[in-house]
Amino acid sequence: MAQGDSWFSTAAAQAHGNLLQELMFKQPAAALNCAGRGESLSHVVDLEAAPEFVRLLGDTSAPAWDGILLSVGGNDVIAAAQTPAHLPDGSEVPLEKRLLRRQTEWGPPSAGVGRYFSEPGWTTLADYLRTNLRHLISLRDQGPSAGKPMFVHCYAVPMPRPAAAEDGRGPWLYPMLKAYAVPSADWLAVSRLMVMHLAQLLKSLAADKEQFPHLHVFDSTSVPLATATPGSSGVSGDWHNEIHLNHSGSFKIARAWSEAIENVLVGPPPKPVKAGKGR
């Protein structure tokens, strides 16, 4: 069974690339995709707001799935990065509730691109993601799929650029980095910093076998992708728009993830036996 954000959605707006559809295994396999064709999940907390998914995950009458595939966390990071420094009434948004710092809050240049980043805001977001993923684990373990592997992927590093989706959404990072006056030369590095923070968090959760049993995280940041050209507004590199992959990008990540999933479900392929020397 699968559930998640736009990287799993089969909506027409995502026809350019769907990570789930690019998965390929040696044995026949099928997944019930709860992300469906309509609005995919915007935030990880919305998973529980999808009653059919919750029923299929944890109800005693649900099937026992071989595994659960999740695409979660990316939109939460994007939303946190989009949080402005001030509300419409002029009041300041505290650092604990946003990921970017105003120019007067920047650290010293010696801090690198980390000087633009709100660590207090990241702590808030990490606690939120940790709590909700732990809740998903508990839902799984209430039903017939208790102890079955739950597979989560990390994301890839997008180039902040003026590339919106066909349905008018976006761009996502580009306007906020401009609003926070982050130098354009540092945009990609700031994007990488946020994606890597999420990847490190997800991997740390998977390493906590007591609180997050049978959680398997695939580090998609290690898959080489063609970065979009700075300033481009359309398809570029392995990207369809600012934050969504095209078919080639989805293909590259999905093929590597397929192997990682298969290694858990059926075990790694046997190592070749070295031929002995003849007498």
For each feature predicted by the language model, list its residue ranges.
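Serine-esterase "nucleophile elbow" of acetyl-processing enzymes
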Residues: 1-38
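Short catalytic/ligand-binding loop motif for oxyanion handling, primarily in non-cytosolic enzymes
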Residues: 9-12, 41-42, 76-80, 158-164, ...
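Hydrophobic, aromatic-enriched interface-forming segments
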Residues: 121-174
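Substrate-gating cap/lid alpha-helix
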Residues: 162-217, 250
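Histidine-centered active-site loop/cap adjacent to the catalytic His
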Residues: 236-279
